[in-house]
């Protein structure tokens, strides 16, 4: 673990966890193997690189229950979503001590099993997602996992930087980059969608008073109908090249899986960005939401459950923004006097329908260069 000494915000809990071990994976071939799916590997990486500081491993039952009931770890630190590793009851008997963690058959890490326990998944679903509806993608993923949770500290042996290695930064690396650039105030923006004009508006409003923007799209597992990560990354790049000041933006990828936990996931996203070194985090309308499971601004209101210093990152709360044809600008309810018939608002579902049909996206909704990247990509999907 690395003490925090720079002017950037301290990591959650005061130290940046690093549990990366330099060793040849073949040294551990004698250990029982546990194959990780995409979500479990993402959690392993995020623990080991410090994104999930102060966690050093998958949660034991005491922390798990405390997070469900209180949104805090047993040491009192705010934490909103259990980070756990599920296996089948049959396989659990084989995992009693040190376990070799594999991805696609390759050894990528180690887990020192300290505890096994059975969760109440219905209770977990209601606490985290506020529903047990299997149509909710987060709930479906929860019930598809094994019924026994393994807890213990982890070590990462292989950091897989995925398909975007030049943008795949660890918290240690982003903190170094922010310092090299002389940024003292950094706003992070989380997205799983292509950037449209309303997003651009939020970014530039924030950049009027802050030093840098950390554009940090999630590229882990998402719903099947979300825009694929390679397409989104191409769209982000063309947008940044044409419309953003290059010396004030850093594009990175957030390798987490999307949980669609709405308000609780907003807290996890904010804490994670604090660990990357950011001082501010944008939370807009229906952050990390899906369907109609959460109210449009519940992900903002949940931060009121904590004292600001407990979260340790400034939350920038924005209302829905949209293009007003009468104002001829991107505006919000705070700045636009016109009713909704003057507003251009396209849902993600409608955008995907237009793309699949080969129809152009309105320039009031997104930049033409972005629209062309999306149109071309969808013609080949």
Curated annotation (Swiss-Prot):
GO terms for molecular function: ATP binding; sulfate adenylyltransferase (ATP) activity. It is an enzyme of class 2 (transferase). Signal peptide: none annotated. InterPro entries: ATP-Sase_PUA-like_dom (IPR025980), PUA-like_sf (IPR015947), Rossmann-like_a/b/a_fold (IPR014729), SO4_adenylyltransferase_pro (IPR020792), Sulfurylase_cat_dom (IPR024951), Sulphate_adenylyltransferase (IPR002650). GO terms for biological process: hydrogen sulfide biosynthetic process; sulfate assimilation. It comes from the Bacteria. It catalyses: sulfate + ATP + H(+) = adenosine 5'-phosphosulfate + diphosphate. This is Sulfate adenylyltransferase. The gene is sat.
């Amino acid at each position: 673990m690395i003490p925090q000494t720079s002017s950037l915000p301290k990591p959650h809990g005061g130290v940046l966890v690093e549990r990366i071990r330099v060793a040849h994976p073949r040294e551990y071939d004698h250990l029982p193997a546990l194959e990780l799916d995409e979500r479990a590997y993402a959690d392993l990486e995020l623990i080991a690189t410090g994104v999930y500081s102060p966690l050093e491993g998958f949660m034991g039952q005491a922390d798990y229950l405390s997070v469900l009931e209180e949104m805090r770890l047993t040491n009192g630190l705010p934490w909103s979503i259990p980070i756990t590793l599920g296996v089948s009851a049959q396989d659990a008997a084989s995992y009693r001590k040190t376990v070799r963690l594999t991805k696609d058959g390759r050894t990528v890490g180690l887990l020192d099993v300290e505890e096994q326990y059975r969760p109440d998944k219905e209770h977990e679903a209601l606490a985290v997602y506020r529903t047990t509806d299997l149509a909710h993608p987060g709930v479906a993923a929860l019930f598809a996992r094994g019924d026994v949770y393994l807890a213990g500290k982890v070590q990462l042996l292989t950091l897989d930087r995925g398909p975007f290695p030049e943008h795949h930064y660890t918290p240690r690396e982003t903190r170094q980059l922010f310092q090299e650039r002389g940024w003292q105030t950094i706003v992070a923006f989380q997205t799983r969608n292509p950037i449209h004009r309303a997003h651009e508006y939020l970014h530039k409003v924030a950049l009027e008073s802050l030093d840098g923007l950390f554009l940090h799209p999630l590229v882990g597992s998402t719903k099947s109908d979300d825009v694929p990560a390679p397409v989104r990354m191409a769209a982000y790049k063309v947008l940044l090249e044409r419309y953003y000041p290059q010396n004030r933006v850093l594009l990175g990828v957030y390798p987490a899986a999307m949980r669609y936990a709405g308000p609780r996931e907003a807290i996890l996203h904010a804490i994670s960005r604090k660990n990357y070194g950011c001082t501010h985090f944008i939370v807009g309308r229906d952050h990390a939401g899906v369907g109609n499971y959460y109210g449009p601004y519940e992900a903002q209101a949940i931060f009121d459950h904590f004292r600001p210093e407990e979260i340790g990152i400034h939350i920038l709360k924005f209302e829905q923004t949209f293009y007003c044809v009468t104002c001829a600008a991107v505006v919000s309810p705070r700045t636009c006097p016109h009713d909704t018939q003057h507003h251009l608002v396209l849902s993600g579902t409608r955008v995907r329908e237009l793309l699949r049909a080969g129809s152009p996206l309105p320039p009031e909704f997104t930049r033409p260069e972005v629209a062309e990247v999306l149109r071309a990509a969808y013609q080949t999907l």
